[in-house]
Amino acid sequence: MAVIGTITVTSAGTAVQNPVSGNCRGIMWRARADNTGAVYVGYSNVSSTNGVHISPGDAFTALFNGYERLESWYADAATNSDKVDFIADNS
């Protein structure tokens, strides 16, 4: 079963926790094409210097050996109000 959601980074430079909880085997992140700048995904300390850089319209997929908690992932952005969508496999 898939879990689908969106994270909106209201304030650039401030990490936003994934609002969905539960286990997953993988997550695909896609930055919205109409974003002004890049988004960054990672753990609670995610930033432009240590997160996975995703340009507007691009995607990044993380696959795990076993399960990872969805709420352990965060997003940050270079620009206020940019969004990143995600789909996670929790089967």
Regions found by a protein language model. Give the residues of each.
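Surface-exposed ligand/attachment interfaces on beta-rich extracellular proteins
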Residues: 1-22, 80
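Ser/Thr- (and often Asn-) enriched beta-sheet segments in non-cytosolic proteins
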Residues: 3-8, 40, 53, 74, ...
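Short, solvent-exposed S/T- and G/P-enriched segments that are highly enriched in secreted/extracellular
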Residues: 7-17, 49-66
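Asparagine-centered strand-capping/turn motif at beta-strand->loop junctions
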Residues: 18, 24, 29-35, 77
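Noncatalytic modules at the cell exterior or secretory-pathway interfaces
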Residues: 25-27, 65-82
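Short, surface-exposed beta-strand/strand-loop-strand elements in extracellular ectodomains
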Residues: 30-52, 85-87
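Exposed low-complexity, polar/acidic, P/S/T/G-rich flexible segments that act as propeptides
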Residues: 81-91
